[in-house]
Amino acid sequence: MLQNFFWIGFWVIWVTGLFMILTYGWVIFFGAPYIPTLKKQQRQAIKLINLKKGQVFVDLGCGDGGLLILAAERGWKVIGYELNPFLALVAWARTRRFGRQVKVKFGSFWRADLSSADGVFVFLIGHYMAKLDSLISNQPHKRLKVVSNAFAIPRRKLIKKRGAMFLYQYPDNR
């Protein structure tokens, strides 16, 4: 009896570990592991980006959707990209009450169309920031505000910094 209990426990732990690796671990190869942006930092990002009602806000790596909710409450049209299937589902469930105002897209934001965006938020690992700059620079858009959490975009003119948040504008005069 004790031996059966051991094997059941072993398989539960093994399957849970495999699930965690598959849903959380592999995304590090595409940007960053899931580290939620603190509420205080979310509010700082919203204040920095300062969009008007009806403008389009994009969160590249929206995690559990916390920032999507804050943006939608301000009347912004919101798009969140998330590579982790579990977190994409959580973000979708948390933002359902906003209807078509919020879209959660499961997949890599490296292929995202940002041409309609007025503001973008991102929390990446430092060595991906130059790649992010290329992604944004190579897309057609009018004026785009970009807020980065914790990591600066190399060779970009910083507009403003609040706490760990960096505000940039595209196109800029480097």
Predicted regions and their residues:
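Conserved SAM-binding motif I beta-strand of class I
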Residues: K77-E82
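Glycine-rich SAM-binding Motif I of class I
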Residues: G65-I69
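Conserved class I S-adenosyl-L-methionine
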Residues: G54-G63
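A short SAM/SAH-binding and catalytic strip from SAM-dependent methyltransferases
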Residues: D118-K131
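Conserved SAM-binding loop
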Residues: A91
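S-adenosyl-L-methionine
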Residues: M1-K52
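Conserved SAM-binding strand-loop segment of SAM-dependent methyltransferases
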Residues: F98-F109
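C-terminal substrate-binding/active-site "lid" region of AdoMet-derived donor-dependent transferases
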Residues: Y128-R174
